[in-house]
Amino acid sequence: MANPERIDVMVCLATVTPPKLVQVQVSATATVADAVRASGLLEEVGLSIDACRLGVYGKRKAPDALLHAHDRVEITGPLIADPKAARRRRVRRVRATGTREGLKWLRNEAPPEDDVAG
């Protein structure tokens, strides 16, 4: 018979390494942070709970959010690359190819000299 004071939750660590899943049993009043600590996954990879984003079924949650039975707690690591810098690199790469696709970002700039009628 199941203990009504304990619930089963799944904790998933999603970083650059392959994801790791651990099933833990926590108290019925446990928070997201309690489940993460009980899983021991952060100690394995050397991360702190403050450096990670936490969520339940893909929705971001605060560490003090309460859990329900059979929830899946997700731990995502910090971003490796700055999204703005990555986008700038992609745009620069497309512009360098000289294709029409690369020109759509240049609307407010003068057209290239070879396109000017003369």
UniProtKB/Swiss-Prot annotation:
<dbReference type="Pfam" id="PF03658">
    <property type="entry name" value="Ub-RnfH"/>
</dbReference>
<protein>
    <recommendedName>
        <fullName>UPF0125 protein RSc1426</fullName>
    </recommendedName>
</protein>
<dbReference type="InterPro" id="IPR005346">
    <property type="entry name" value="RnfH"/>
</dbReference>
<dbReference type="InterPro" id="IPR016155">
    <property type="entry name" value="Mopterin_synth/thiamin_S_b"/>
</dbReference>
<comment type="similarity">
    <text>Belongs to the UPF0125 (RnfH) family.</text>
</comment>
<dbReference type="InterPro" id="IPR037021">
    <property type="entry name" value="RnfH_sf"/>
</dbReference>
